[in-house]
């Protein structure tokens, strides 16, 4: 076991030396198992240039997960300021790199991907894109798949709350097996998005979880461009009436929902999520009786969206009967974020008005819980 650890330390040293050699102009020396203050570093590498000396403190791990990265980074932040704290592991996942950056800790992997940053940015090395072989962990649930994302949606909807596994499984907007919730819980904890405190699941990083969900979010299962007589608002009225007359659940979405959540969001093409039943041929053909609704290749003023999962309708009830149902701020953000240009601007407006404060307060609450444990 000791030999394996020593071999990994030598590997880490060689990779860092190679990175510094690529830059040129450094004289490099190293020490293994060196004590620095109250801490002990696996490897300390000293890199001297003509006008500066940089000391890199390497913590070497055979395998590192986002969950273990958090505690490791908290410890490494206590190192003296003249050291550049760096994690080395053969494989560094994007999530581990993200957490390390959040704490101001550097990282290096076997392939040479790295971020090394000294105080005052006198040294800044950021290399990405080198392929590192990795295998996905077995038996781990993808939290962003259609069913699993229902769990994520419920957690983000009340980010300061603690949840029991069964409570999540039985939530009206979730309704999945206890087994799936347990798997997703494990993934969220291991990926550093959540913690378990007194047998309750809390979100540690709701902002990061939402950002990564947005990157993976697939959008509607189907999009049908439609034209109705009149403008986008008239098209929304026509589809709303068609849905009511045929008892079809629906919700204004995309820019249509964004405008109602943040008035600065402007749109000339509406979007509406319609329950799968609305796509049945017999029901769909009735749209022609509503402002001449028809499918078009160009010139659409409304996009008819088939949901990837019924959870898009969560929290879509209108504030009053006079208003049409629209997607929640969370769902609206996801749909707008995937649209380039104005979509991203609109997503930011919705986020700032309706999501940012709640998510940040949730993260603050979890930090308080963690401090209570110390």
Name each model feature, range by range.
Residues 1-35:
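Acidic-basic catalytic patches of nuclease active cores, encompassing PD-(D/E)XK
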Residues 39-80, 85-87, 333:
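Conserved catalytic cores of phosphodiester-cleaving nucleases, focusing on short active-site segments
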Residues 80-104, 108:
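Nucleic-acid nuclease catalytic cores
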Residues 102-115, 122-126:
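A short alpha->loop->secondary-structure connector
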Residues 123-152:
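Short alpha-helical segments that sit at the start of domains
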Residues 151-214:
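Loop-centered beta-sheet repeat module
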Residues 221-310:
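Short gly/ser-rich loop at a beta-strand->alpha-helix junction or flexible surface loop bordering the NTP-binding
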Residues 281-374:
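Hydrophobic alpha-helical interaction segments
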């Amino acid at each position: 076991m000791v030999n394996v650890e020593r071999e990994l330390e030598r590997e880490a040293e060689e990779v860092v030396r190679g990175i510094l050699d690529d830059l040129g102009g450094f004289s490099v020396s190293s020490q293994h198992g060196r004590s620095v203050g109250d801490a002990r570093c696996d490897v300390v590498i000293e890199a001297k240039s003509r006008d500066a000396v940089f000391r890199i403190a390497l913590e070497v791990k055979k395998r590192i997960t986002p969950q273990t990265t958090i505690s490791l980074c908290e410890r490494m932040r206590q190192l003296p300021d003249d050291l550049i704290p760096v994690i080395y592991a053969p494989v560094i996942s994007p999530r581990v790199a993200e957490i390390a950056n959040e704490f101001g800790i550097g990282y290096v992997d076997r392939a040479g991907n790295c971020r090394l940053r000294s105080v005052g940015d006198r040294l800044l090395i950021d290399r990405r894109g080198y392929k590192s072989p990795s295998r996905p962990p077995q038996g781990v649930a993808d939290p962003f798949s259609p069913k699993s994302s229902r769990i994520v949606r419920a957690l983000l909807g009340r980010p300061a709350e603690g949840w029991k596994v069964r409570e999540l499984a039985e939530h009206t907007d979730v309704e999945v097996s206890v087994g799936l919730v347990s798997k997703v819980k494990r993934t969220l904890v291991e990926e550093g998005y959540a913690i378990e405190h007194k047998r309750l699941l809390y979100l540690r990083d709701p902002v990061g979880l939402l950002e990564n969900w947005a990157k993976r979010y697939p959008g509607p299962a189907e999009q049908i461009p439609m034209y109705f007589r009149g403008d986008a608002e008239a098209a929304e009225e026509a589809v709303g009436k068609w849905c009511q007359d045929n008892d079809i659940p629906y919700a204004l979405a995309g820019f249509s929902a964004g405008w109602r959540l943040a008035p600065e969001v402007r749109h000339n093409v509406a979007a509406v999520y319609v329950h799968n039943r609305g796509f049945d041929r017999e029901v769909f053909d009735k749209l022609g009786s509503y402002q001449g609704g028809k499918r078009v290749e160009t010139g659409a003023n409304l996009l008819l969206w088939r949901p990837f999962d019924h959870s898009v309708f969560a929290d879509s009830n209108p504030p009053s009967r006079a208003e049409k149902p629209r997607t929640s701020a969370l769902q609206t953000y996801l749909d707008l974020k995937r649209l380039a240009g104005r979509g991203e601007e609109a997503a930011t407006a919705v986020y700032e008005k309706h999501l940012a404060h709640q998510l940040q307060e949730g993260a603050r609450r979890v930090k308080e819980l963690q401090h209570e444990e110390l």
